[in-house]
A protein has these predicted regions:
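Cys-nucleophile CN-hydrolase/nitrilase-fold catalytic domain and related Cys-dependent amidase chemistry
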Residues: 18-109, 178-193, 197
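Short beta-strand scaffold segments in enzyme catalytic cores
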Residues: 89-91, 103-106, 138-139, 204, ...
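Active-site catalytic loop in hydrolytic enzyme cores
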Residues: 94-171, 175, 180-193, 269
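CN hydrolase (nitrilase-like) catalytic-core segments centered on the catalytic cysteine
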Residues: 68, 72-86, 156-248
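Extreme N-terminal starter segment of soluble prokaryotic enzymes
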Residues: 1-7
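C-terminal beta-strand edge segments of enzyme domains
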Residues: 208-295
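Short polar catalytic/cofactor-binding loops
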Residues: 9-15
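Hydrophobic residues at beta-strand termini and immediately following loops
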Residues: 8, 116, 140, 243, ...
Length: 295
């Protein structure tokens, strides 16, 4: 079974209206649809571009972003339906019970919307934007495999990816937003490590461009990539495809899930199967116990 995925290196720049944001998003989605992609991944914090709309800084506070939630939902839902694709609309800041959450959204062709809040929050998100960490990990079972969405900093924590794999995820989508080479490579190297540890695919992308009037979004350093385990059937460096750093573009690749399953059973190394669960937690067993308690 194969999945075709596209990842958008989203160009942030000052805009004057939500319509401009809509036009830019639509351009990327329709471009990916021309490649007949099953999934389209946008980066973290793409809706911070909406904070640049008003020259008088009416929208410059992160607290104003939730007011765009309905428009954001309508836009991505309509595009998912129109193109019959699953769209991970990057992340958008929403408000629940007076708290702000940085939430990744999965837009289904049938109109459903899945949500995965960011679970690990960076110091800047806490200190400058008062973002609250989400609670709970979920995976998204689909007709073509099971996926999870772990945002940027989340991918730097091996345990949460172990949990996602134990819950059945074969593909981890990682929308990110980093402002320099240090941050970018932390995320990128973590993505590679997670593919090796769990024998999964990771699809990642980041923001490029700049928002000169939006604090903490003035600099962006991003690159999309489709990352594989390091074994004989895959590319030697574990990179199926990657974009040009800091360019406005889309990358597209096919993920062969059958090949992934084969490597887990008969690969040069079988890292998932060879875990020493007598020495450290067995996440498959923990997930099973959790499901029994819930059920």
């Amino acid at each position: 079974m194969k999945l075709r995925v596209s990842a958008v290196q989203y160009h942030l720049h000052t805009i004057n209206s939500f319509k401009e944001f809509e036009n830019q998003v639509t351009h990327y989605v329709k471009t990916a649809a021309e490649f007949k992609s099953d999934f389209i991944l946008f980066p973290e914090f793409i809706t911070t571009q909406l904070m640049s709309i008003d020259s008088d800084n009416i929208f410059s506070s992160i607290n104003q972003l939730p007011q765009f939630t309905e428009q954001y939902y309508n836009l991505f839902s309509s595009l998912a339906k129109e193109t019959n694709t699953h769209i991970i609309g990057g992340t958008h800041v929403i408000e629940e019970n007076g708290k702000l959450y940085n939430v990744a959204h999965m837009f289904y062709p049938d109109g459903r919307i899945g949500k995965q809040p960011k679970l690990h929050i960076t110091p800047t998100e806490v200190d400058e934007w008062n973002i609250t960490p989400g609670e709970g990990l979920q995976v998204f079972p689909l007709s073509k495999g099971t996926v999870a969405v772990l945002t940027c900093y989340d991918i730097e924590f091996p345990e949460i990816v172990r949990m996602a794999k134990a819950m059945g995820a074969d593909v981890i989508f990682c929308p990110s937003c980093t402002d320099d080479s240090h941050g970018f490579h932390r995320v990128r190297y973590s993505c590679h490590a997670r593919t090796i540890e769990n024998q999964v695919y990771v699809v990642t992308t980041g923001t490029v461009g700049a928002l000169p009037t939006v604090d903490f979004m003035r600099a962006n350093y991003g690159q999309a990539a489709v990352i594989t385990p390091n074994d004989v059937p895959f590319p030697q460096r574990g990179i199926m495809i990657e974009g040009d750093i800091n360019n406005d573009m889309i990358v597209t690749a096919d993920l062969d899930l059958d090949l992934l399953y084969e490597v887990r059973e008969k690969g040069s190394v079988t890292t998932w199967r060879d875990r020493r669960v007598d020495l450290y937690p067995d996440f498959e067993e923990l997930v099973k116990i959790k499901n029994e308690l819930i059920g």
